[in-house]
Curated annotation (Swiss-Prot):
Its EC number is 7.1.1.-. One of its GO terms (biological process) is ATP synthesis coupled electron transport. Its main location: membrane. It is found in: Cell inner membrane. It comes from Syntrophobacter fumaroxidans (strain DSM 10017 / MPOB). It holds the Pfam family Oxidored_q2. This is NADH-quinone oxidoreductase subunit K 2. It is an enzyme of class 7 (translocase). PANTHER family: NADH-UBIQUINONE OXIDOREDUCTASE CHAIN 4L (PTHR11434:SF16), NADH-UBIQUINONE OXIDOREDUCTASE SUBUNIT ND4L (PTHR11434). Keywords: Cell inner membrane, Cell membrane, Membrane, NAD, Quinone, Translocase, Transmembrane, Transmembrane helix, Transport, Ubiquinone.
Length: 114
């Protein structure tokens, strides 16, 4: 039984919407990263459905690229989250001022060059 292309796009759209909700509505950095991963998987489902619909390999090639981007995003994102948690003790994005240049420079000036 072949799944209609409209159903595949409906599933991908629902997953993408769920990922957007998870990334926007939560106040937790891990949930934000999880929401972005759900959105990338929804895009992968849409590309696979389109590749099956039009019998082309480009959709599958895009999925491999998306998987590489997702793996990179998870590894770098979780490393940043672990660093930020060790520094502040919280997963709440509102608690972070780590991206301000002044904060980094003040921290460097207090410690001095190493």
């Amino acid at each position: 039984m072949i799944v209609p292309f409209g159903h595949v796009l409906l599933l991908a759209g629902a997953l993408f919407g769920l990922g957007v909700f998870c990334a926007v509505a939560r106040r937790n950095l891990i949930m934000i990263v999880l929401g972005v991963e759900i959105m990338l998987n929804a895009a992968s489902i849409a590309f696979i459905g389109a590749a099956a619909r039009w019998q082309s390999m480009e959709g599958q090639a895009f999925v491999l690229f998306i998987l590489a981007v997702a793996a990179t995003e998870v590894s770098i994102g979780l490393a940043i989250i672990v660093y930020a948690f060790r520094r502040t003790g919280s997963f709440d994005p509102a608690a972070y001022n780590l991206m301000k240049a002044g904060d980094a420079m003040q921290s460097f000036e207090r410690r001095g060059p190493q």
